[in-house]
Amino acid sequence: MIDNKLKKFILKEANDRCKGTLVSTLDINFTDVGETFLVAEMHVTPKLHQPAGVLHGGATAALAETVGSSAAAIFSKKEDQMLRGVELSINHVRGISEGTVIAKAEPIHMGRTM
């Protein structure tokens, strides 16, 4: 279990690292971290809408890529390697025009390097 002090440190570092990037432009914020998971939230406003008035799929993809890649970087056991996403598949179940969307990244398998 990650203690509160370490949790706050990891979340602050993750959010600070994203300042001035697409992540901050989309108002994505990391909100929770545990031993093997990372959570981020994105507040849906009209600036994130597609012309039909619902959340743009690209914004959803950016949220998923952000939380997945950030989790990989945080939990990597190799400090000399930079991890990045390789493939992304998004299925939209329902549209949303306002509120908050939440993404949680959890590994399927933690090996020697991850």
Residue positions per predicted region:
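Terminal targeting signals and extreme-terminal segments of soluble enzymes
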Residues: 1-114
